[in-house]
């Protein structure tokens, strides 16, 4: 098989770089690049600067693992939240969706993925050791009384919830799962706030 050469010109490199975005193929990347250069060069410059700044400054919260520019994110630092209640989600986008329901007042842990052996994602890749440390040795000084599993209702999300749930239950930790108001195969990021709020309230 012939080796595919990387594009050498700036436009080709831009098109290739845009393809790292989910769902963006060669034609979509080309349209984006052409639009930015033809219609919005100032916007392209702002985009490039903002992306560079985010890559340099955005890390992970030391407590919940979500994206944060500070060691402890604003959610974890909020003293009004219930530190004895921990909600586990797959991604920062899922955390945002749960927050928008206004029905959860505890803290979070963001796995940054889900168990999927075919994709090379196991317990280590979803920061399971950090999660256990977070639960068994909470730095808030308040024991965690309930862990809410809010992974997606995909096969990988269910496998992740099952794995985490079994380990935590064996340690005597109360574990609940959000209710199935969310369709099988559904992802939290695309569920309306009302449905998600009901799923949280009906957890068991």
From Swiss-Prot:
The keyword Lipid metabolism does not apply. Residues 84-183 form the Toprim domain. GO terms for biological process: DNA recombination; DNA repair. One of its GO terms (molecular function) is zinc ion binding. Keywords: DNA damage, DNA recombination, DNA repair, Metal-binding, Zinc, Zinc-finger. A zinc finger (C4-type) spans 61-76. It comes from the Bacteria. PANTHER family: RECOMBINATION PROTEIN RECR. Belongs to the RecR family. This is Recombination protein RecR. It comes from Polynucleobacter asymbioticus (strain DSM 18221 / CIP 109841 / QLW-P1DMWA-1) (Polynucleobacter necessarius subsp. asymbioticus).
